[in-house]
Amino acid sequence: MKSRGLSVSTTNEHPDSQRLLADPLAGSESWWQQIAQWGTPLVEPISEDKVRLTFLWREPVAGADEPTYSRVYIDVNGVTDHHSTHPETLQRLGQTHVWYWQAEVESDFRGSYSFMPVTAEHCLNLPEGTPQERRQAQRNWWISLMDLAQNDPFNHTAPHSSYRGRPLSAVHLADAIPQTAWQPIDAGQQLPTDTQRLQLITWHSELLGNSRNVWIYHTHGTEDNAERPLAILLDGQYWATRQPIFGVLDNETDAGRLPASVYVLIDIIDQPHRSVELPCNQDFWQALQTELLPQVAALQPFTDQASRTVVAGQSFGWVGLAICRITLAAAFWWCAESSPVPSGGRMLIISKL
């Protein structure tokens, strides 16, 4: 899944979160103006390769018809565990309207995040039941929070959204691997799409018994069309409409960082279909290979070399592409459900198939 950039500008080299949180003026208008100047989350080095992130949320001043918030949940990709029965929450700073949460991560961290402020009736309260029933109840509760999610208005980069439409902000630390391709998007620019090279088709699958949109895009190059690499993007509706990737691909190709290629973006239809088709569904991959790809090749030829074929996905999409490759892999590693997420913000890879 892509993340967005963040730069923090300060009058000192780094903001001092402990001093800021202890400031008697914390929560005042002048205090928030200073936070807005710095940008959030606040970033403080704590060792050669670790930093402390301080996330801040400003609670609106409640009027007679406005809710009083009991919790502000935070979801930071790769740091917090949204499967937990004790999800991470911000703390209120005394009697102020300041809520904060801190985490230590590696200095090359990059990830998206959102806040979910809730009133008492939306706080997690799991019913009695089997472990499986409680896990499902927790998942249903978490999904119900997506409509309450907010991006961070004090983050200096342009907000974006998840494939579900959830508002997101992002952290891009100084040592993170550069993602120059997305810098114009992070700055709020709109990259144009060459509609002459974009085709939208409807894939009617006999094997799956359904129909969906598929976007086909090709980038410029001098290579023989029949030798062009193929890239398949799952959750294609996200990359085609919500976070259009076509201008980014053109820029990277023109800069020589990507070869001229054919890109196939596959719609999920809806969430129920996504949940069935992407994880561990051999019929989906069989239909893709025997039904969809021949249609694509007739419109935009591409290589049949596996070494020049890429499948990209996230979440269920990642599981799907893993299943696509698992029978050919000598070893396959994943993070067990029960393993903790370390404070450094990286999942422990502890299991092997």
From Swiss-Prot:
Keyword Hydrolase in annotation: yes
InterPro entries xref list: AB_hydrolase_fold, Enterochelin_esterase_N, Ig-like_fold, Ig_E-set, Mycobacterial_A85_antigen
**Enzyme nomenclature, EC number:** 3.1.1.108
Q: Which GO terms describe its molecular function?
A: enterochelin esterase activity; iron ion binding
Q: Which UniProt keywords apply?
A: Cytoplasm, Hydrolase
**Would you indicate the residue range of the signal peptide?**
none
Which EC class is the enzyme in? hydrolase
Q: What does this protein do?
A: Catalyzes the hydrolysis of ferric enterobactin (Fe-Ent). Is responsible for the release of iron from ferric enterobactin.
Q: Which family does it belong to?
A: Belongs to the Fes family.
| Cross-referenced PANTHER family | ENTEROCHELIN ESTERASE-RELATED, IRON(III) ENTEROBACTIN ESTERASE
User: In its UniProt entry, what is this protein called?
Assistant: Iron(III) enterobactin esterase
Tell me which species this is from.
Answer: Yersinia enterocolitica
Gene expressing this chain = fes
